[in-house]
Structures are given as C-alpha cells and as structure tokens.
Curated annotation (Swiss-Prot):
Naturally occurring in which organism (per UniProt): Escherichia fergusonii (strain ATCC 35469 / DSM 13698 / CCUG 18766 / IAM 14443 / JCM 21226 / LMG 7866 / NBRC 102419 / NCTC 12128 / CDC 0568-73)
Topology relative to the membrane: Multi-pass membrane protein
Record localization: Cell inner membrane
Top-level taxonomy: Bacteria, Pseudomonadati, Pseudomonadota, Gammaproteobacteria, Enterobacterales
The gene coding this protein: ycjF
Main localization category: membrane
Record-given protein name: UPF0283 membrane protein YcjF
GO CC aspect terms: plasma membrane
Family: Belongs to the UPF0283 family.
UniProt KW keywords: Cell inner membrane, Cell membrane, Membrane, Transmembrane, Transmembrane helix
Pfam families recorded: DUF697 (PF05128)
Transmembrane segments: 70-90, 100-120, 213-233
HAMAP family (UniProt xref): UPF0283
Length: 353
C-alpha cells in the first residue's frame, strides 16, 4: 500500500542563506607606515637534538688558544735543540773516534726518525679527516651547480676511497643511469641515491648493533665502573668501524679529536633519568612498571651510543645529507625499546620453565 501524502507546511520566517565571507577593502600603506611595518615571525620549536648537537660540535671543534700556540712553539724549539745537540755530539764522536758514543748517536737518530715518521703519519691521518670536511663542502657546491664535467670524477674518487669495486651492482647502476647531458648536480644526486646508501646501511647496522649491545650490557651489569669502561671501549670501536667504512684511517690524534664526544657519552646519568620519567609515554603501562633502574640506564647508554654513531657517521660521510636520509635518533630508540621489551618478556618465561 502507498502512504498518503503529508500536508504542506508553511514557515513564517525566511530561509537562512549561507553568508559567504566578504573580502576586506583594500588598504594602502604610506611610507611612514611601511617603515614601521614588520612581518610577524613564528617562533620555531627547537629541534629535539639541537642543543646536544651544539655541544658535540663545540667539543669537536679545535680551539686556537694562545696557550696552545705557546706550547707548540716550545715543543718545536725543544725538538730543534735536540736535533742540533745530536748533530754536535755526532761530529765530536766522529772526530775523537769515540765509536761507543757514535753508536749511541746512531741509535738516537733512529729513535728520533721513528718518532718523526709517526708524527708525520698521524698528521696525515688527521689531515685526511679534515679533508673529508672539504670534500663535503665540494659536494655541496656540486649539488648546487649547473655545470658539467666535475661530478663524475668526484664521485669516482669517493667510490675509490670507500673501497667500492667497479663491478659492484650499485656502482654499475649509477654508471648506467648517468649520461653526458646531465649536469654535476644530477650526477652527484644519482650517486647519493644509488651508491652512498650502500655504505650508509652498513653504518646504520653498526650503530644499531653497538647501541643494542650497550643497552643490554648496562642493563645487566652490576658495577658502574665496568659500565663506563664498557661504553668507552664500545664507542671507540664504533668510531673506528664507521671511519674505516667510509675510507678514513683514524690515527692517535684524529681519534683524540673524537674522544671528547666519547666522554660526553660516558656521562649518561642525566639521560637515564629522562628515560625513566618519559617511559610511560614510550611504552605501555605494564612495561614501564617493570622497567628497572638498570634497564633505564641501559636505554640511556644505548641512546647516547646511537647519537655518537650518528655524529661520527656525519663527520666521516663524504656527502651532505639529502632530503630525509639522515638517521634519526627516534628510529634507534624504538629498536632499543623493542629489544629491551623482548628481553623483559623472555625473562619470566625462562623462570617458569
């Protein structure tokens, strides 16, 4: 059956019409008002790692102080005096035919020569580490250049320094992707997207493994002194592996330049307190309730180890970061928390068995 039609309904008031926003009248500013006009600036929120990155940069940046110049000048003068005195002793021993003294002078000359050779080798390694910063500047210039002819030679030099063989699949894909009509910016960009991620992936794995080992070891270690020694040893090994991965051989002085960052990494007590305070936001209620003090310290040590690895990766990397390819601390944080969660969940299971 069909329903009967409803009666008509008459409304007293008019229908409401949607009022579209109207544009304001045009305003013209005179010269006085234009001088007093200033655009509003939004306060950008500080980055999560900005303050700590500034501290790391300050720790790595060598300070050219007057005392350092005086010490270097004194050492140079002392070395020149030792060499001059040795030459004089050698001449006197030769004239007087004092063969014992002449043999001692020869032994001293060999020792001094070995010391000079070591200093030259260390200086060369330190120069190589500083040269990597110049290579990043050169790569940054090429990424903003519209010229041609320099990008391919530069990328081939980087591949040779990193020990990438010519038959490597990533390098072969890069050779197949470039052609003569491309400029330097396009050639370097292709290298950054095809070849450089091979080394970056290996560096990320090294950082993730070292951070996980630091987290788990600190969480189960009962001695604070052992914790500090373990962190220092693991971080030094991490620096060496990352530098070797990017084709840089670290010497004593170049390693000392990064050792200050390791000292910052040892002092992880403050970060551990922060991890305990914000643990409720990172994990579930159950896991945060079971998170012990040692486990929180382990997470803090792992996060700072990951930060150290990211900074060492940035210093040893020949190319600047492009787009979003820079590793984030949050990625390693999620991995550490996941591994710690699995460890805490496996512990009660083993006890029950």
């Amino acid at each position: 059956m069909t329903e009967p039609l409803k009666p008509r309904i008459d409304f007293d008031g008019p229908l409401e019409v949607d009022q579209s926003p109207k544009f304001k009248a045009q305003q013209t500013f005179d010269e006085n008002q234009a001088q007093n006009f200033a655009p509003a600036t939004l306060d950008e929120a500080p980055e999560e790692e900005g303050q700590v990155e500034a501290v790391m940069d300050a720790a790595l940046r060598p300070k050219r102080s007057l005392w350092r110049k005086m010490v270097m000048g004194g050492l140079a003068l002392f070395g020149a005096s030792v060499v001059g005195q040795g030459v004089q002793w050698t001449m006197n021993a030769w004239q007087t035919q004092d063969w014992v003294a002449l043999g001692g002078c020869a032994a001293g000359a060999l020792i001094i020569g070995a010391g000079v050779g070591s200093v030259v080798t260390e200086w060369r390694r330190l120069w190589r580490l500083r040269q990597r910063a110049h290579e990043r500047d050169e790569a940054r210039d090429l990424l903003h250049s519209h010229g041609a002819g320099k990008g391919r030679a530069f990328c081939e030099k980087l591949a040779q320094q990193a020990g990438i063989d010519q038959s490597h699949p990533a390098l072969q894909r890069w050779y197949a992707s470039i052609h003569e009509t491309q400029n330097d910016r396009e050639v370097v960009t292709l290298y950054a997207h095809l070849v450089q991620p091979v080394l970056d992936a290996q560096a990320r794995r090294e950082i993730s493994r070292s951070a996980a080992e630091s987290t788990l070891m600190i969480a189960v270690s009962p001695l604070a002194l052992v914790d500090m020694a373990f962190i220092a040893w693991r971080n030094l090994r991490l620096i060496n592996r990352i530098a070797t991965l990017y084709g840089i051989e670290l010497g004593y002085y170049s390693r000392l330049r990064l050792f200050r960052l390791v000292l910052l990494n040892i002092a992880f007590a403050g970060a551990s307190e922060l991890v305990r305070e914000v643990g409720m936001d990172w994990m579930s209620q159950d896991l945060a309730a079971r998170l012990s003090t040692r486990a929180a310290q382990g997470i803090g040590a792992g996060l700072l180890t990951a930060r150290l690895g990211i900074k060492a990766m940035e210093l040893c990397r020949p190319l600047p970061w492009l787009d979003d390819d820079k590793p984030r601390l949050g990625d390693f944080r999620r991995q550490l928390i996941g591994q710690l969660k699995e460890t805490l969940q496996k512990a009660p299971t083993r006890r029950e068995n």
